[in-house]
């Protein structure tokens, strides 16, 4: 990206914001396929340093902690892990680590350690300076204008998360800002935000054309690009529940704020498919211990990370 002197500084901010957004997107839409085993490992153990720590555990301690986790996943204590039990556990794990990460971020953003994060503190942490855009004045430069819109959107979300209208966000409000999908009072705001961005004709719905954004069909092409076919399939089969060719506010929600349920269910089914030796569509402790590495390279143990977090392997959860 080439920027003139006037836009260089803000261009760097835009790159930072884009990188941050990409990180969030990757959390929600982790690629499958060739990286399947890596995805499994991170789901159970976490990042590479957690995997390394797991390896350092003695075999007996590894098995002891793994058995403790298996016992907790088995909600009805029947000795088997079903798809539902695995999915519920993985979703709980996602939420636990998201909350832990938000708590760590809160400390970093709270520059004066007063247990609140102000908008200025958020800006300083994100961009090393306080940024203030005029909401009603568009910028001529396309990149500057793109960043202005992104920044104003974050500001509105920050203000919505601030329930008590105090000088900044408490920890709970900061979690609502970072993870609106986990907080009920943010739902309506997120939907309205999506409508403002995508509902071009103002009818209160998002059509397929609006869903696809700026894509224009190429009359010289024999068929649509593969990514368009995928997006159309998602629109029809995943989001448009009443099959009326448009997304109403409630149908918008799983698109704009996807939760982890689908990811967790897919991972649970993957584990059962790979580890179920007798074809009963569930996993016994024996089947898991027959191939523990696969289980420890999956979301079920956050890629083994849970073996180092006593929140998961201690008796009281």
Curated annotation (Swiss-Prot):
Main location: endoplasmic reticulum
Tissue specificity note: Ubiquitous.
Signal peptide (UniProt feature, chain positions): 1-22
Disulfide bonds: none
GO cellular component: endoplasmic reticulum; endoplasmic reticulum lumen; nucleolus
Keywords associated with the record: Calcium, Endoplasmic reticulum, Metal-binding, Phosphoprotein, Repeat, Signal
GO molecular function: calcium ion binding
SMART domains for the chain: EFh (SM00054)
PROSITE patterns: EF_HAND_1, EF_HAND_2, ER_TARGET
Record flagged with keyword Metal-binding: yes
Pfam family, one: EF-hand_5
Domain (EF-hand) ranges: 61-96, 97-132, 150-185, 186-221, 227-262, 263-298
Residues the record lists as binding Ca(2+) 2: 110, 112, 114, 116, 121
Protein localization: Endoplasmic reticulum lumen
InterPro entries associated with the record: EF-hand-dom_pair (IPR011992), EF_Hand_1_Ca_BS (IPR018247), EF_hand_dom (IPR002048)
Binding site for Ca(2+) 1: 74, 76, 78, 85
Phosphothreonine PTM positions: 137
Spans through the membrane: none
Residue interval(s) of motif Prevents secretion from ER: 314-317
Sites where the protein binds Ca(2+) 4: 199, 201, 203, 210
Chain residues that bind Ca(2+) 3: 164, 173
Amino acids binding Ca(2+) 6: 276, 278, 280, 282, 287
Chain sites annotated for binding Ca(2+) 5: 240, 242, 244, 246, 251
PANTHER family hit by this protein: RETICULOCALBIN, RETICULOCALBIN-2
Family to which the UniProt record says this protein belongs: Belongs to the CREC family.
Protein name: Reticulocalbin-2
Native source organism of the sequence: Homo sapiens
Source lineage: Eukaryota, Metazoa, Chordata, Craniata, Vertebrata
Gene: RCN2
């Amino acid at each position: 990206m080439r920027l003139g002197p006037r836009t260089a500084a803000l261009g760097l901010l835009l790159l930072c914001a884009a990188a941050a957004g990409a990180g969030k997107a990757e959390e929600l839409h982790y690629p499958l396929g060739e990286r399947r085993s890596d995805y499994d490992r991170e789901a159970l153990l976490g990042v590479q340093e957690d995997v390394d720590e797991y390896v350092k555990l003695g075999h007996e301690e590894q098995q002891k902690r793994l058995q403790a986790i298996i016992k907790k996943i088995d909600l009805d204590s029947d000795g088997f892990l079903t798809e539902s039990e695995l999915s519920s556990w993985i979703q709980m794990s996602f939420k636990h680590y998201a909350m832990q990460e938000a708590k760590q971020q809160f400390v970093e953003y709270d520059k004066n350690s007063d247990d609140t994060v102000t908008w200025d503190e958020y800006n300083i942490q994100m961009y090393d300076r306080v940024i203030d855009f005029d909401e009603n004045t568009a910028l001529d430069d396309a990149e500057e204008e793109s960043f202005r819109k992104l920044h104003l959107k974050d500001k509105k979300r920050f203000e919505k998360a601030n329930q008590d209208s105090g000088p900044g966000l408490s920890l709970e409000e900061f979690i609502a800002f970072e993870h609106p999908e986990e907080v009920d009072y943010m739902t309506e705001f997120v939907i309205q935000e999506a409508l403002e961005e995508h509902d071009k004709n103002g009818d209160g719905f998002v059509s397929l054309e609006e869903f696809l954004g700026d894509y224009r069909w190429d009359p010289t092409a024999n068929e649509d690009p593969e990514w368009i076919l995928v997006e159309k399939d998602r629109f029809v089969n995943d989001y448009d529940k009443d099959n009326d060719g448009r997304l109403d506010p409630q149908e918008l929600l799983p698109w704009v704020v996807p939760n982890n349920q689908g990811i967790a269910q897919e991972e649970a089914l993957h584990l059962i498919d790979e580890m179920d030796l007798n074809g009963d569509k569930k996993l016994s402790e024996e089947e898991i211990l027959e191939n523990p590495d696969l289980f420890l390279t999956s979301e079920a143990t956050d890629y083994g990370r849970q073996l180092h977090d006593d929140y998961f392997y201690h008796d009281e959860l």
